UniProtKB/Swiss-Prot annotation:
Pfam families the UniProt entry points to: Ribosomal_L9_C, Ribosomal_L9_N
UniProt cross-references to InterPro entries, sorted A to Z: Ribosomal_bL9, Ribosomal_bL9/RNase_H1_N, Ribosomal_bL9_bac/chp, Ribosomal_bL9_C, Ribosomal_bL9_C_sf, Ribosomal_bL9_N, Ribosomal_bL9_N_sf
Name by which UniProt lists this protein: Large ribosomal subunit protein bL9
Keyword Ribosomal protein in record: yes
Keyword field contains Protein transport: no
Role: Binds to the 23S rRNA.
Family assignment from sequence similarity: Belongs to the bacterial ribosomal protein bL9 family.
Molecular functions per Gene Ontology: rRNA binding; structural constituent of ribosome
Length: 147
């Protein structure tokens, strides 16, 4: 019998592959445990339609991420913090503060965990990197001013 694997099965194949297996193994184990479906014409057609939809969604998501990357590369945000007598910041600027400033100043919401920087403790311009997903990274400028 032919089955369409829904999940990866050790020693048989990866999800999405069509495999020829013995009837008992296919019916009693693979299909019963939810690892596969019988590879009928309708099931294969439905699987192909789902794959096309996933590919289209991925293309749309990648296009949006590239657009966001382009938008972020043109942005400079400014954060003002109190400074000491020697010109150094009290405390520092955290990822949370950077994400909040990006939301407040440019209306771009990002997760603070996607920021790739340490706590900033110096005045001046800094380049901040963001992981957007799907191996796409963006950079924007952060200006730290003293109050």
């Amino acid at each position: 019998m032919k089955v369409l694997l829904i999940k990866d099965v050790k020693s048989l194949g990866k999800a999405g592959e069509v495999k020829e297996v013995k009837d008992g193994y296919g019916q009693n184990f693979l299909i019963a445990k939810g690892f596969a479906k019988a590879a009928t014409h309708e099931v294969l057609k439905q699987y192909e339609a789902e794959q096309k939809k996933k590919a289209e969604n991925l293309r749309f998501e990648l296009a949006n991420l590239e657009k966001l990357k382009e938008e972020l590369s043109k942005i400079t945000i400014c954060i003002a913090k109190p400074v000491g007598a020697n010109g150094s910041l009290f405390g520092g600027i955290t990822k949370d503060e950077i994400a909040h400033a990006l939301k407040e100043q440019k209306n771009i919401e990002i997760d603070k965990k996607s920021l790739e920087c340490d706590t900033i403790k110096e005045l001046g311009m800094h380049e901040i990197s963001i992981k957007l997903g799907h191996a796409i990274h963006a950079k924007f400028k952060l200006e730290v001013k003293g109050e």
